[in-house]
A protein has these predicted regions:
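Helix-loop-helix junctions that connect adjacent transmembrane segments
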Residues: 185-254, 283, 299-303
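Extracellular loop-to-transmembrane helix junctions
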Residues: 51-111, 121-161, 282-286, 290
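Extracellular/periplasmic helix-exit of transmembrane alpha-helices
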Residues: 81, 198-212, 276-319
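Membrane-interface "cap" regions at the ends of multi-pass membrane proteins
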Residues: 1-50, 85, 94, 102, ...
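Flexible loop linkers connecting adjacent transmembrane helices
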Residues: 11-18, 78-104, 125-144, 171, ...
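Membrane-water interface regions at transmembrane-helix termini and the short interhelical loops
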Residues: 81-86, 107, 161-186, 261-267
Length: 379
């Protein structure tokens, strides 16, 4: 026994080796909650418009396909969980270059960055439109005869939002993700209120709860067939109609690609926390986006619903049980949250684009200027 203790003693008292990492920039790591909030900043915003857009093309069956897309998102997340931990210098550029060649690598990276560049400004302008509409409606309610130009005001708001999140990301992802987490919390509260309040409203109606569910009938519009619109044979094949309907609902996945970009910033234990990040994103998206789409179809009358195509949650707020003034207050709250989450989509696009450009710069594709750290913040 003494001999065994003597043998084990050196290994038990061995000192941990200290490692010093030399780097040109400051490392910053964030929690899985913050990482999830960054991705949801873009992914969650689709709840405002996805149901209305999909219904225009596929009819009232849209909520079922949106639910299917969000379940499919779990499979996409599984791919990210498997591929993101595999360190590949240069990221998507290096992977595509080694498999398809340099030209395809440049096209793929350019397309990805272009997607992020479009996402930010479009989301911020949309948020500006929501805010401008709310401001003009509020002034009208209080009898103030002043109406702001929605286009100019939305542009001004968009510029402020983009500059704000750009500066937050200059200070580091810890700063920008903190703002994203606050937006995520407010959005989660709003989503819970909408879904619970909506279910209660349906339960208190005379008809049975399940009688309100939309019928499982695909009614594709002429435009939804695209280049197959004149092919009558295609309209007779059910599988083609299902695939087209599914395709028109894929927009609900917008922003999910940022999940692969935030992996490097997730704190230790990295893979375990990354799995938690994916789980939070899945539970949030599979609840809010399809839930809003179903409630929009079940609560808002068919002849009124087209008015709320771009803001389905705002329409739901007006048909919830309760006094009219409470509906108006809740609708204003929904619009404000919409402005916030659309602003969060700007942060998501900046984080994603920054990560892609960093990977490409590390592979010496871009000049050294892109890798130059900030003098004050080291980012």
């Amino acid at each position: 026994m003494d001999t065994d203790s003597h043998i084990l003693k050196p290994s038990m008292t061995a000192k941990t080796t200290k490692v010093i990492v030399l780097t040109t920039v400051m490392f910053t790591f964030i929690s899985f909650w913050r990482a999830a909030a960054v991705v949801i900043g873009d992914l969650g915003s689709t709840a405002y418009y996805m149901g209305g857009i999909a219904e225009q093309f596929v009819g009232t069956v849209a909520p079922y396909f949106i639910l299917g897309v969000m379940i499919f998102a779990f499979c996409v997340m599984a791919l990210y969980l498997e591929s993101s931990p595999l360190f590949t210098r240069g990221g998507v550029y290096r992977v595509v270059k080694s498999t398809l060649g340099g030209w395809f690598a440049k096209v793929s990276v350019s397309a990805l960055v272009f997607d992020y560049i479009l996402t930010g400004p479009i989301s911020s302008v949309s948020g500006g439109h929501y805010l401008a509409g709310l401001l003009n409606d509020t002034l009208k309610v209080f009898g103030i005869d002043i109406q702001f130009d929605r286009n100019i005001l939305s542009m001004a708001v968009a510029i402020v939002i983009v500059l704000f999140f750009w500066w937050e990301n200059v200070k580091g992802i810890e700063e920008s993700s903190s703002k994203a987490l606050k937006i995520f919390i407010i959005t989660a509260i709003m989503g819970a209120l909408v879904i619970v309040w909506g279910i209660v409203t349906l339960l208190l109606k005379d008809e049975p709860f399940f009688a309100h569910f939309p019928p499982l009938e695909i009614n594709l519009s002429h435009e939804s067939y695209g280049w197959l619109s004149n092919a009558e044979w295609a309209k007779t094949i059910g599988l083609i109609s299902i695939l087209i309907a599914f395709g028109h609902s894929l927009l609900a996945l917008s922003g999910l690609e940022t999940l692969g970009q935030v992996y490097r910033e997730v704190e230790y234990p990295k893979l375990k926390n990354f799995k938690k990040t994916a789980l939070i994103i899945f539970l949030f998206s599979v609840t809010l986006t399809p839930g809003v789409s179903f409630l929009g179809t079940m609560l808002i009358p068919d002849n009124v619903r087209p008015q709320y195509i771009d803001n389905l949650i705002g329409g739901i707020a007006m048909f919830l049980i309760g006094p009219h003034w409470l509906n108006l207050v809740f609708q204003a709250f929904v619009v404000i949250v919409g402005v916030l989450i659309l602003s969060g989509a700007v942060n998501t696009s900046i984080v994603g684009a920054n990560s892609v450009l960093n990977r490409v710069a590390e592979d010496k594709v871009l000049t050294e200027w892109f890798r130059k750290p900030h003098k004050k913040y080291g980012t």
